[in-house]
């Protein structure tokens, strides 16, 4: 049995120039995940369920667990001293860590502390998503928003934690995707999958079909394609949608499938956040042999203009994403009014 800590250190030794700072940063995320895991498991017993009574910058109600997870991860990252600051879906602006050590830190972290938190009240899987970049401002100076507004191709590492029947941490540093399962009796994450890849073909599609009438024409046509009978392509595909990006992505990664959150009449720019959700998941998908686009453009090539920028999102098995892109190209964008 190999623990996450042992695995990270082992991989660090493969690079003679490694300083251990990224290793320490990942350890901070690991600690935050353990704390969130602990409290999610007793969410029905303590007063951390339901809405907090405040809204985030997008105007969405923040759940109590959103704020709890945000504070715990922020504290864990600040304590290590390897991070200059963070940007979070739950924060209006970037958070600059104070102190001389933070000003000389190499990295910034972007995160969705608790994705799918609206599901927690009914005991559905939720997750934490994180993305790590090297700062671009000079060491010894405060970081700025520019450090966070980098394209996804600049990510140093990305990953997620899924809190389900078991808690799993999945991450990449650009050398494959690795999965670790939490053993609560030992308090450690244990290696459960190394260099995980999407199956060559997929048979599941994940989309909120309740919004069908609002979808672009190409997406509607692709959904019908997924539902049609065709033995040669093993259709119809199975529809599976949990409503938690991390849970849907994780299932499709292991089983083969596509996750779609397109633009709609009410959200013409898409709804998922480019920096906190799309970029880290796109990095993981590509490292696992999959593909991620906004329906036309590669997600990782998009240069962000603002912290809470949104984007349509198509991610999963490469052939399925390419099929969806084909329908979008063939049937020009047409949204229901």
UniProtKB/Swiss-Prot annotation:
List, alphabetically, the Gene3D superfamilies matched. Answer: 3.40.190.80, Fructose-1,6-Bisphosphatase, subunit A, domain 1
According to the record, cofactor stoichiometry and binding are noted as:
Binds 2 magnesium ions per subunit.
Cofactor(s) required, per the database record = Mg(2+)
Write out the catalysed reaction.
beta-D-fructose 1,6-bisphosphate + H2O = beta-D-fructose 6-phosphate + phosphate
Q: EC number(s) per UniProt? A: 3.1.3.11
Q: Which domain of life is it from?
A: Bacteria
Instruction: Write out the residues that bind substrate.
Output: 115-118, 208, 241, 271
* Cellular component GO terms held in the UniProt record: cytosol
Q: Which InterPro entries match?
A: FBPase_C_dom, FBPase_class-1, FBPase_N, FBPtase, Fructose_bisphosphatase_AS
From the record, what ranges are coiled-coil? none
| Annotated keywords | Carbohydrate metabolism, Cytoplasm, Hydrolase, Magnesium, Metal-binding
NCBIfam families assigned to the protein according to its UniProt record, in alphabetical order: PRK09293.1-1
Q: How does it assemble?
A: Homotetramer.
PANTHER family assigned to the protein according to its UniProt record, in alphabetical order? FRUCTOSE-1,6-BISPHOSPHATASE-RELATED, SEDOHEPTULOSE-1,7-BISPHOSPHATASE, CHLOROPLASTIC
Family that this chain belongs to = Belongs to the FBPase class 1 family.
Name assigned to this protein: Fructose-1,6-bisphosphatase class 1
Annotated source species: Yersinia enterocolitica serotype O:8 / biotype 1B (strain NCTC 13174 / 8081)
């Amino acid at each position: 049995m190999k623990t996450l800590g042992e695995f990270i250190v082992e991989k660090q030794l493969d690079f003679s120039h490694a300083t251990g700072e990224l290793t320490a940063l990942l350890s901070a995320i690991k600690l935050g995940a353990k704390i969130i895991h602990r409290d999610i498991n007793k969410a029905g017993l303590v007063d951390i369920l339901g809405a907090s009574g405040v809204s985030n910058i997008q105007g969405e109600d923040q759940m109590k667990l959103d704020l709890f997870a945000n504070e715990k991860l922020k504290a864990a990252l600040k304590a290590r001293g390897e991070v200059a600051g963070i940007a979070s879906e739950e924060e209006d602006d970037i958070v600059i860590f104070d102190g001389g050590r933070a000003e000389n830190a190499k990295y910034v972290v972007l995160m969705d502390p608790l994705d799918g938190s609206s599901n927690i009240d009914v005991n559905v899987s939720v997750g934490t998503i994180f993305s790590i970049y090297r700062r671009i401002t000079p060491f010894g100076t405060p970081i700025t928003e520019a450090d966070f507004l980098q394209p996804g191709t600049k990510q140093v590492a990305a990953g997620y934690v899924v809190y389900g029947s078991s808690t799993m941490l999945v991450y990449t540093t650009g050398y494959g995707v690795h999965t670790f399962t939490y053993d609560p009796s030992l308090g450690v994450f244990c290696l459960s999958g190394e260099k995980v890849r999407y199956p060559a073909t997929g048979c599941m599609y994940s989309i909120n079909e309740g919004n069908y009438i609002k979808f672009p024409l190409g997406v509607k046509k692709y959904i019908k394609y997924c539902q049609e009978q065709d033995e040669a392509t093993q259709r119809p595909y199975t529809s599976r949608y949990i409503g938690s990006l991390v849970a849907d992505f994780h299932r499709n990664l292991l089983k083969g499938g596509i996750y779609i959150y397109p633009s709609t009449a009410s959200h013409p720019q898409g709804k998922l956040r480019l920096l906190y959700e799309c970029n880290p998941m796109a990095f993981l998908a590509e490292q696992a042999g999959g593909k991620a686009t906004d329906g036309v453009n590669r997600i990782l090539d998009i240069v962000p203009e603002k912290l809470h920028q949104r984007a349509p999102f198509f991610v999963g098995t490469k052939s399925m994403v390419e099929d969806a892109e084909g329908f979008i190209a063939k049937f020009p964008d047409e949204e229901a009014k």
